[in-house]
A protein has these predicted regions:
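A compositional/structural signature for long, glycine/proline-rich flexible linkers
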Residues: 1-170
Length: 170
């Protein structure tokens, strides 16, 4: 975070309003059948601030977290295969006591469907995290997107708007 916005705690209000990928101003290859939320971040290279996303798997066909480098307009790690820049639904490990409805043999309407995703500076201790994406030290401007594809008609954008965003000190 830049010095003027460096804080800790709940920052759920930092999420954008949900928007459709059909909007012409949406960058990063939007899909018109998806609903998006994003959080734009400007940070100093030595910053140790990370982000914790806690929510429920959406009632939708697909969901994923993608982290982009705003300067290059590419995924945060580009073509570096040793790091991940995105976390898809099927690869997201559910919180203890919960189930991932995107995995085989799990009912889509499972009630316990919570997960936690961390986005933290590269070099942070991630040994206690099941789901994480690291931020390269040299990336100062990034956007974290949550994409929900084809939410069910009975759910409001897949019910992921309640995903809580927290600043953490990695």
């Amino acid at each position: 975070m830049s010095k003027e916005t460096n804080r800790r705690g709940n920052c759920t209000s930092g999420w954008s309003i949900p928007f459709s990928g059909s909007k012409k101003w949406v960058i990063f290859d939007p899909d018109m059948n998806a609903t998006y939320w994003y959080c734009a971040v400007t940070r100093d290279p030595e910053d140790t601030t990370g982000f914790k996303f806690h929510g429920k798997f959406g009632h939708a066909r697909y969901q994923a977290y993608n982290v982009y480098n705003d300067d290059t307009k590419d995924l945060i790690w580009g073509d570096d295969a040793t790091h991940i820049s995105a976390l898809s639904d099927v690869n997201t490990v559910p919180d203890e006591g919960s189930n991932n409805p995107y995995q085989l043999a799990v009912p889509r309407d499972t009630r316990e469907r919570e997960y936690t995703v961390w986005v933290v500076p590269d070099g942070s201790d991630t040994s206690g995290y099941s789901n994480f994406i690291t931020i390269p030290e040299d990336v100062e401007k990034l956007s974290i997107f949550l994409r929900v594809y084809l939410p069910t008609r009975t759910s409001k954008a897949g019910c992921v708007a309640k995903t809580e965003l927290m600043y953490t000190n990695s």
